[in-house]
C-alpha cells in the first residue's frame, strides 16, 4: 500500500480525521491523475423506468462471518431500503440452508456456473448492472451491515440523476472506487460480463483486490464523468457530505462482525 494510503489508514484508526483527510485526499488525487481519459466513448443503455432496485452481493463459502451478516442484511433491507431487493450471486459452496434463509426474507439468489465460477467471486455481483429488469443497483459486501446513513446517501444520489454513486466513510477508503460502496443506474456499463472476462483473461495481480483493480483500471475514467460522490473525509470529486449523524464506532461498510 502506498505511503499516503498508509498514513490515511493509520490516522483513521486513531480517529484523527483531519490528518486522515489530508493524506487520503493526496492519495486519491494522485491516483486519479494516473488514470488516462477514455480512449473510446462508452454509451450507456437505457434503464427501465420503475424497474427493480437491487442491493447486489457476492457470496461464496459457508463461513458464518459472511452468512450471518448476509442474513441480517436481508432482514434490514425492507426497513432501511424499502422497495429494494437483496440479491446474492453464489456458487455451489454456499449451503442450501443459507440460500433458503435468504429467500425466506425476500432475497433473490442467482447461482453462478462455468465459466464465471472461475472469476474472483467478488466480481459476480457486478453482473446486476446489465439486468434488463433492474433500474438501480448498489454493490455491497456480504459481511458489512447496511445502515441508515448508507440508505440516505443512496436516496440523495438517485435524486441527483447521475449514473454513478460512490461513498467514502473511513480512513481506509482511499481506493478510487470501493467495490462494495458504489452504485449505478443499470445499463450505465454495457457488456459488463465481457469486460470482466477480458480483465480476467489478461491476468490480474491479486485475487483479493481484483474487483477494485478492475473498477479502477477499466471503468474509473468513465465513472468519474457522471458521478455523485459522498465523502466524509477526503473532499474528492466534488463530494457531498454523507447525511445523518456519524458514529466513530460504525462507518458505512464496517465489517467487524
Model-found features: residue ranges?
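Active-site-proximal specificity loops/subdomain of glycosyltransferases
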Residues: 92-135
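Short aromatic/hydrophobic "clamp" motif used to bind/position activated sugar donors
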Residues: 137-139
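Conserved donor-nucleotide/metal-binding helix-loop-beta segment in metal-dependent transferases, i.e.
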Residues: 146-177
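Catalytic core and acceptor-binding pocket of nucleotide-sugar-dependent glycosyltransferases
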Residues: 185-257
